[in-house]
């Protein structure tokens, strides 16, 4: 965050944040409201939600949704972390792909016909068309997402400029702590759910406010969220579905429904299910997203209706600093998308999916807490933060 502010000289900082489920197909560790507090305490001025219909998608759709929201908020610069760290290399790679589009598409099809996943096929296709050191490594997850952010900016004819910060010391999927002060999200999550989990083990890798809020959430609600806690619901859901039912679920295609229904019969945990389900054709992340859609009962038709315009239909405001509130007050007449401070009275196909996702997310809670949290989510107004006193209002 501090590097972003230093690089962009920003007046205010806006974060677009996923809701209950994330792009890699996992439930968020804690609720979006706790994560909003974390962001505000770390210097973000406005926190807005990326709807489920975009946040649990491949990089291209995820980026389109995020950029459409930032564009509507009249953001002048976007900053993202990447393995490459050189913004000009992203633009060079986009230019090469555009010039070699016919060859690129042919190669992707060729590699997919050989049984590779779409992600692997595109990575291999890029290897074949990119020869210069001024191009990015498209096998790296943060490079891929950054590439799609810039493509979305160009596609949406936005005047937004892009900046990137190089990731170092740890990689996205690292499962262990390889540095004294920097760790991947994967390694932090693994530590939090380990047999001898302790918040003290991760305190040197995350901001103090974040560690405090994580501990507070676990104390107040008795848990942090991961896939294993939803496995019994997930298995029950699949046990009551036919292959035809499953085919209606978003991202279930090419006969995947038969493999899923077969593998669930002998699986006693989500991890063991995923280990038996994965193939060369489908990445772990791609399968996890499909599982998320099964869990939330999100159909192809629902996603089509929600994403028909290919941009976010509204802006759900989750939190703001005093500075962020001033920015919104000054610019609200220029912002074309409706800004939602709660969702109780607003109606849209995208929001229908969101409500289901929230219901599922809180399903692991005991009553009456579960009902209280669901009711509160629809009526919850944006969290306000006074950055001068470092206190929530």
UniProtKB/Swiss-Prot annotation:
Biological processes annotated in GO: tRNA modification
Function comment: Catalyzes the formation of N(4)-acetylcytidine (ac(4)C) at the wobble position of elongator tRNA(Met), using acetate and ATP as substrates. First activates an acetate ion to form acetyladenylate (Ac-AMP) and then transfers the acetyl group to tRNA to form ac(4)C34.
Cellular localisation: Cytoplasm
Gene: tmcAL
Cellular component terms per the entry's GO annotation: cytoplasm
Pfam family, one: HIGH_NTase1
Binding site for ATP: 81, 142, 167
Source organism superkingdom: Bacteria
Record-listed E.C. numbers: 6.3.4.-
Family annotation (HAMAP family): TmcAL (MF_01539)
Protein name: tRNA(Met) cytidine acetate ligase
Catalytic activity line of the entry: cytidine(34) in elongator tRNA(Met) + acetate + ATP = N(4)-acetylcytidine(34) in elongator tRNA(Met) + AMP + diphosphate
GO molecular function terms attached to this record: ATP binding; ligase activity, forming carbon-nitrogen bonds; tRNA binding
Keywords from the named record: ATP-binding, Cytoplasm, Ligase, Nucleotide-binding, RNA-binding, tRNA processing, tRNA-binding
Family statement: Belongs to the TmcAL family.
NCBIfam families (alphabetical): PRK13670.1
InterPro entries attached to this UniProt entry: Rossmann-like_a/b/a_fold (IPR014729), tRNA(Met)_cyd_acetate_ligase (IPR008513)
Gene3D superfamilies: HUPs
